[in-house]
């Protein structure tokens, strides 16, 4: 394979593979009954042992006994109190225990593995110690930025991100010098597998192996194959951590095959849609009425930033063009634009230079832009889990938000029924008089 050749890139269509319906929280790895704490289920070998700290709600990050440099960075970021998932996972994870964690969008899962791995890391020049994999380029880029944010007082820590759609030669050049060789690698499975296979990236010193949005990678056969090959290139005694907002009963045993007696953490009952502070509505209308209704909503609603989801790259481009012609400050992010342009647009939106983003499901998972407080499903997704990930872009980390879904076909009505059944909610119709902005504006 030539180094310049673009490798496997997982497109929007592949991301639409329907997730299996999730059930209630599983029992522990040893078959022990799970330990329930409110809406938090904890199980696994460490859950009931003294000294594991599980269930002790720390009042601050200092209680985790993290490195001083990390605590300084956390303070700089303005974080005061850990989220529920951080309180449960971090004290056990820093003891080198494997972790399988499912928690809804916006609860701070990324910080769990970023802080844990940075705390444990002792950088050695020319050695990669931490490997983090995710299923899209945008998420890889964002995770790399999180590492940069929290390692600002750790000057010896080098982080690199590798994904398909960019020239492989650049990656090889970075890996060929001890001065630039990263101690932390973040990337997508296709590109990482190629670098390992071509012996450009060595994984023999890996101490932590992390999968973010693990169900998406282990659900799809070709991605799972890449993950397995990469896993086999790492040492047997590493720590394995996996995270996702949705973990079906079918996927959990697959995850646990990579692990040794993991701590299992499932926040909130799987069947409940609990995005706290997020108002959700639907609007019934014909396909031809969507543009007019969207225009009305963007004109009448107050919002900081809005993300509008559509079902294809072509529709994303067309809707973005239409919005710009109507003088709305819009941008489109989907797999139909070049990687360089995609990252540029993502940064433009994240830095608040644009307030409206039209996107496909490639933007539906894990992307964390705190100013988004309105999500519109111009096209309803194909399944309930995709709906959860999409609307979770608004109302991140406990803030308020508003989600509106257009329902225009019989198939949409079926998906709406599935959402209501899956999450045991009854989504109301959008009120004719609109919604008071104080209900969703922080």
UniProtKB/Swiss-Prot annotation:
The keyword DNA-binding does not apply. GO terms for molecular function: ATP binding; ATP hydrolysis activity; RNA binding; RNA helicase activity. Keywords: ATP-binding, Helicase, Hydrolase, mRNA processing, mRNA splicing, mRNA transport, Nucleotide-binding, Nucleus, RNA-binding, Spliceosome, Transport. Residues 293-438 form the Helicase C-terminal domain. It catalyses: ATP + H2O = ADP + phosphate + H(+). Residues 90-265 form the Helicase ATP-binding domain. Its main location: nucleus. One of its GO terms (biological process) is RNA splicing. A motif (Q motif) lies at residues 59-87. It comes from the Eukaryota. ATP-binding RNA helicase involved in transcription elongation and required for the export of mRNA out of the nucleus. SUB2 also plays a role in pre-mRNA splicing and spliceosome assembly. May be involved in rDNA and telomeric silencing, and maintenance of genome integrity. This is ATP-dependent RNA helicase SUB2. It comes from Ajellomyces capsulatus (strain NAm1 / WU24). The gene is SUB2.
